[in-house]
């Protein structure tokens, strides 16, 4: 919907939201009703939370009804992730900080297919096993994030780069899955455009983060 040639009236949908609209269009073509699509809304709400898109317009509606599914009848994979949360009713903020990081951790540390297996599993026992593995990935992600951020800050200090207008750091063994998080941490610390590099095969991989009014993409 952000394409200039797209006439759809709401342009803040995340990728999953666009996918849901496709499913909705297919359902209408097959004379199905919105009731047939409710089972997907826990995933849509999770994606809205994970992508930090604005909770306005259609996102607000999708998030509201998605949260109702999460709090009443979530799919086994989501249920397995939240069953130890000591809250009776989860909000979109809870999904941002509890559900989304765990799903993202699979792709950051191992492979995104593990998260796909979790959210498409119908057997609760198997889903709980997948959730346990993903919980370990999330713990590993936190530890890597902490360690690499520490190393990056030390590198800046050792190179006397505390007062530069930008941050560029590199270490060949930094885990590619967390350098984006590390870049965000460095922006929080120095508030300046930041690029974190690591080695990926025979090439370099990097994540960039910036500050308000400074576009590192264009």
Residue ranges and their predicted role:
Residues 27-218:
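Hydrophobic helix-and-loop "lid/oligomerization" segment in the mid-to-C-terminal part
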Residues 1-18, 28, 35-36:
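Hydrophobic, small-residue-rich alpha-helical packing segments that form membrane-like cores
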């Amino acid at each position: 919907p952000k394409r200039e040639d797209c006439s759809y009236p709401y342009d803040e949908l995340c990728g999953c939201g666009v996918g849901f609209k496709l499913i909705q269009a297919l359902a209408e073509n097959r004379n199905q009703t919105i009731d047939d699509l409710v089972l997907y809304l826990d995933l849509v709400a999770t994606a809205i939370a994970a992508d930090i898109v604005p909770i306005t317009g259609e996102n607000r509606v999708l998030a509201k009804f998605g949260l109702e599914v999460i709090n009443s009848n979530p799919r086994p994979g989501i249920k397995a992730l939240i069953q130890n949360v000591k809250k009776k009713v989860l909000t979109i903020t809870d999904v941002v900080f509890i559900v989304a990081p765990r799903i993202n951790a699979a792709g950051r540390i191992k492979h995104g297919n593990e998260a796909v297996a979790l959210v498409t599993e119908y057997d609760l026992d198997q889903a709980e096993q997948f959730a346990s593995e993903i919980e370990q990935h999330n713990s590993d992600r936190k530890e890597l994030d902490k360690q690499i951020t520490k190393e990056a800050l030390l590198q800046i200090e050792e190179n006397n780069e505390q007062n530069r207008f930008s941050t560029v750091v590199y270490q060949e063994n930094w885990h590619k899955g967390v350098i984006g998080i590390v870049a965000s941490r460095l922006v929080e610390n120095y508030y300046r455009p930041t690029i974190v590099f690591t080695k990926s095969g025979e090439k370099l991989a990097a994540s960039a983060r910036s500050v308000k009014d400074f576009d590192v993409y264009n």
